[in-house]
Amino acid sequence: VHRSITGTYLKLYANVHNGADELMPLTGAQRRFHHTRAADPRDRVRILPVFVEFPPGLLSTHRLEQATRSVLLRHPALRGAADTAGGVPVLRIGPVPEGPIVREIVASDTDGAVWAALDDWPAERGSFRVILARDDRRDLLAIGFDHLVCDGESTGLVLDELMSRYQGGAHVPDSEAAAELRRYRDAVERQLAREHEASGPEALAHWTSRVRDAGPGLWGRGRDAGEPGGRESTWQRVALPGQATDRPFPVLLAACHKALARIPGTAPVAYTWGGQDGAGVVGCFINTVLANPQGDGVRESWWEDLEFVDTPFDEVVRAARASHAPWTGHLDLVLTVIDRTRRPAPVLDGVPGRFRYPPGTRIEDPVIVMAVHDRGELSLRIDHDPTIVPGAAATGIADALREPYVDAGHVAG
């Protein structure tokens, strides 16, 4: 009889929960991040950042502090921290920190300063990191999330609310905070129910067929979790055709698959998928999904995969190992697409901000492709760890991502 990882986890969680309001179960994505961090001798947090630039002197630290506290009261996941209860991984929801949360920095190199501050965030300040870096050219607002408590979709919700609370209405009644705690628990339980449902025989048969001939992984296999690694980045911009109705994701996924297919032994492309943006609940509700078509093109197989995208990553890994597939869970390339078309940069006191993507992020996977879709333009950023990924391979991936748009004549530079 098959017993899903999610089902087994929920039984263990029920034994330690005992009705405690502050203990929450972990979703499949949260389990993955928890496992990755537990295997890291340095116990490093995977940071999900958002950067917004405003004119110098515009932002008030006091108003930002009040807005941040309101956001923390409204979204309990941001007050959460990974923990264990009776040996079972959980998310423990804490109170809003007593001391100042927002950190203000004045520096000549604001890009470097905010990354250093995000990496060196005191544990007692919680999982939600807010930094205001100033110089004579700009105010740079940096928001960092422990990825275990917040996914990419949720960052947009948090930024919208932070800016709204900054403008006014920062008070959050206790009754509202309590209601949001119940709403978060309900969202997590519904997510886990979907993941359990997506871990049945049909879903596992589908993913087993997808990974049966997948490469074992070329770069992620030999990586030491304790090593800091390196980082090199390339950027390119693509002007999307105005008449196009398709979103760029399938094209990018096919390009990433094509790039790795040219390099023997690499693992399948992985991409992030999901979220509960429409529900208005902040948390980590995404999944890491593989794309490894057999025969058909990646776009066609992707449509078939959508029926099973709720199968947790750890369940797919277990199915691959049970079938003795060469691939056993290592990742070489992860694709993330950020859709800015639905969320333009915020406007404060009538002054529009501008999203920024400063270099300096720690590379968690050998290659990370981030595509930012903003109206008629696509910005592609390819980060790789040069200590394990050869420069020629990184260049080949960048070239493969350019090819569909070069052919169509839409490369902007």
Predicted features along the sequence, with ranges:
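Short amphipathic alpha-helices and their capping loops
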Residues: 1-39, 65-108, 124-126, 178-231
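A short N-terminal helical cap/helix-turn-helix that marks the beginning
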Residues: 81-82, 162, 166-180, 210-219, ...
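Acyl-thioester-dependent acyl-group transfer interface
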Residues: 2-7, 11-32, 37-48, 260-314, ...
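Acyl-thioester-dependent condensation/acyltransferase catalytic cores
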Residues: 65-143, 150-153, 160, 164-167, ...
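Hydrophobic "lid/gating" helix adjacent to the active-site nucleophile
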Residues: 71-83, 245-280
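Flexible, Gly/Pro-enriched loop and linker segments at secondary-structure and domain junctions
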Residues: 45-50, 78-84, 120-132, 171-179, ...
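Short amphipathic alpha-helical segments
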Residues: 61-72, 115-118, 155, 159-160, ...
